[in-house]
A protein has these predicted regions:
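Short, surface-exposed polybasic-aromatic patches that bind anionic ligands, especially phosphate groups
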Residues: 66-76
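Structured, non-membrane catalytic/scaffold regions adjacent to prosthetic-group chemistry
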Residues: 1-68, 164
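C-terminus-biased signal that marks the final domain/tail of proteins
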Residues: 18, 22, 29, 41-44, ...
Length: 168
């Protein structure tokens, strides 16, 4: 199914769209890890299909911009108990905990570390688009603090590749 077709045809609000897509993933599962923005005139949600029957959605504040250059970017500290601003699948923490791969930071369940992965060499170009987006919104990253530029030493690197940006 198409997320947009389902949401637009069945939901009156962004929150209803989140709840609808979440219920479909609860029931049927998902074979990909998609990240989509669901918005209406009153609120905007960042929805992430994580794995199998697991998903999470965070209500975005009015004063932020979300950059998603073809990468899922789960770097948020989320309060899973804040049902006003965070909706998620029932087993988002219990399933990975029961199966031994739940990750915790400072004693708190870490959605990003549990379901995400570091951006490897294959994702470096998406990361550079993320940095360009930050610059567009006048929130540039600082070289040496947020990233470093390194020479691309791969044998199959094209001459145009030059340097790659690596997240620190």
């Amino acid at each position: 199914y198409s997320y947009a077709s389902v949401i637009l045809g069945e939901s009156a609000t962004a929150r209803e769209g989140v709840e609808l897509i979440g219920s479909l993933i609860d029931e049927q599962g998902v074979c990909s890890n998609d990240q989509i923005i669901i918005a209406d005139n009153n609120e905007t949600w960042l929805f992430a299909a994580l794995s199998g029957h697991q998903w999470i959605a965070m209500k975005l504040a009015d004063d932020i911009a979300s950059l998603n250059p073809n990468i899922g970017n789960l770097t948020y500290n989320v309060d899973l108990d804040d049902t006003e601003n965070c909706l998620h699948s029932e087993g988002i923490e219990s399933m990975p905990k029961e199966n031994g791969f739940a990750e915790y930071t400072d004693g708190k369940f870490d959605v990003a570390k549990t379901y995400g992965e570091e951006i490897g060499e294959a994702g470096m170009h998406q990361w550079s688009r993320y940095i360009q987006g930050r610059d567009y919104f006048m929130a540039p990253l600082a070289e040496g603090t947020d990233y470093e530029i390194v020479k691309d030493e791969r044998e199959d690197a094209r001459a145009t590749t030059g340097a790659l940006v690596h997240e620190l």
